[in-house]
């Protein structure tokens, strides 16, 4: 009976969902010779031993794009299972950085609106990030006890509250 396979170590990777003033996201193309070469991804990279997730993301964006990350918020964490590796992709969303992103590691870059991104051009893990990015930031949930005749009034009040804010 063969021995059970050793569990693969999990590689923790950070990704930045960088949104510009027009609502576009920055994508980088994986270079030749790397896993999933030619596919597009959100910029970022691996954590180094002892590094915090934000420190890793800040370092990677400086190395790859020449920018200084000022702040980022968690968006989604995606566990990925590839035949050759296990991956935890930790995506953070930001519109706060200093500098103009430029390719410092010979990767192609492009800015696209989230709805313009074809999921098939992304790595499988990055498709989950795109899906999370496309979700609404807020949902309106009607109370369960609202009678049909009260729904119109309830919706009008919600509309008024939105206009005031």
Report the location of each language-model feature:
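Short polar catalytic/cofactor-binding loops
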Residues: 18-23, 32, 142-148
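Active-site-adjacent beta-strand/loop module that shapes the phosphate/pyrophosphate-binding cleft
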Residues: 20, 78-100
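NUDIX/MutT-family hydrolases
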Residues: 91-95, 101-133
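Conserved N-terminal beta-strand and adjoining loop/helix that marks the start
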Residues: 2-26, 46, 77
